[in-house]
Amino acid sequence: MNKLAIQDTYGERFQHCWGCGPKNDDGLHLKSYPAGEACICTFTPDKAYTGGVPQNLFGGMIAMLFDCHGTASAAYFKHRDKGLELTKDTVIGRFITAHLEIDFKKPVPMNSPVTIRATAEEIGERKVVVAMEMEAAEEVCAKAKMVAVAVKDNM
């Protein structure tokens, strides 16, 4: 797995997201890493993010994790598709969510790291379709499909 997080290659203007922005002092600082044909993100939920059912991660947080990891993965997949490598000097093109569909399979426990694996299903000129699975306690808890589009002034 690459040791350089995709989010750490965002341009200065795009580093303030609450979920994944490296420059948001109050944020979660999620990190997505290329790993072969996939991108991986691992997160251990804090008790503050439990939902209406105690000891389970709430759905909005699950959506945010898919959102941040999916757009970072889309940026990487497009970058790689251009034949480029991710380096400390990279300023990667930024993607945003156009559509996010989530299937909640089972509760996500709070006492276990969550791993999200993303793969590219389609890479177009400005659009990347990303498929994701969220695992916790060695079980798939949620699946998502995202359509991410490139921010025009950062490609």
Predicted regions and their residues:
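Conserved beta-strand residues within beta-sheet cores
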Residues: 26-29, 97-101, 115-117, 131
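A conserved, well-ordered hydrophobic junction motif at loop->secondary-structure transitions
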Residues: 40-77
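Hydrophobic beta-strand-centered segment that forms part of the acyl-chain substrate-binding groove
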Residues: 73-115
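HotDog/MaoC-like acyl-thioester-processing domains
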Residues: 1-12, 106-155
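Non-catalytic linker/capping segments at the edges of enzyme domains
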Residues: 1-54
